């Protein structure tokens, strides 16, 4: 999981979601695309 100031979708399978007030990107195709804003 990458922690970044600005989270962006990397591929078309990436989804931007909010969990516990944090913006996150989850990806079903490529787990390395997981990101969290912070």
Curated annotation (Swiss-Prot):
Domain of life: Bacteria
Signal peptide: none
Record-level GO BP terms: translation
Record key words, sorted: Ribonucleoprotein, Ribosomal protein
Entry annotated with the keyword Ribonucleoprotein: yes
Listed GO MF terms: structural constituent of ribosome
Protein family membership: Belongs to the bacterial ribosomal protein bL36 family.
HAMAP family: Ribosomal_bL36 (MF_00251)
Protein name: Large ribosomal subunit protein bL36
Organism this protein belongs to: Alcanivorax borkumensis (strain ATCC 700651 / DSM 11573 / NCIMB 13689 / SK2)
């Amino acid at each position: 999981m990458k922690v970044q100031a600005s989270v962006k979708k990397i591929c078309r399978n990436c989804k931007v979601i909010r969990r516990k007030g944090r913006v996150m990107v989850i990806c079903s195709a490529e787990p390395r695309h997981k990101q969290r804003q912070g």
